[in-house]
Regions:
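Residue signature of alpha-solenoid helical repeat architecture, marking inter-repeat boundaries
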Residues: 29, 62, 100, 139-140
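Amphipathic alpha-helical segments of tetratricopeptide repeats
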Residues: 30-31, 59-60, 89-93, 128-137
Length: 140
């Protein structure tokens, strides 16, 4: 990590749970990557409305399925589970043919179904997530 790279520094701070410092570091940073990281920091501070607005704006600007994914994640964190599930379904339609991206989406859907108390649906999505993860080249 280059010390002058604010996004890399922000992710290092987030790993330590230093979200307010991340926010201070990234305020005013214009790049989409900086705003993705800022949204994450906001969400983990419980500032869901701000994070949602940021990620929805990023989706309008970039069309990135990552932004849609983050909207779903923040909705889930805010306890808006049915809305989160609908967003993850929308994201699934936008995904590239990439096993890791599909695995991540399937995991989110499985986890959200679990939070909704639907264990059978959850298990099906989590098993599909594992299958996709095993097909990816990601070592995790």
């Amino acid at each position: 990590m280059r010390p002058e790279d604010p996004v890399a520094r922000a992710w290092a701070l987030m790993e330590e749970g230093r979200f307010k410092e991340v926010e201070a570091l990234l305020q005013g940073e214009p790049s989409p990557e900086a705003r993705f990281a800022l949204g994450y920091a906001l969400a983990f501070q419980g500032r869901h409305a701000e994070a949602l607005a940021l990620y929805r704006g990023l989706y309008e600007e970039t069309g990135s399925h990552r932004a849609v994914h983050q909207v779903g994640m923040v909705l889930r964190m805010a306890g808006r589970l049915e809305e989160a599930l609908a967003v993850f379904e929308e994201e699934a339609r936008l995904l590239p043919p990439d096993p890791l991206a599909r695995s991540t989406n399937l995991y989110e859907r499985g986890y959200t179904w679990l939070l909704l108390g639907e264990e059978e649906a959850s298990l099906a999505f989590l098993q599909a997530s594992l299958t996709e993860a095993e097909a990816s080249s990601d070592p995790l």
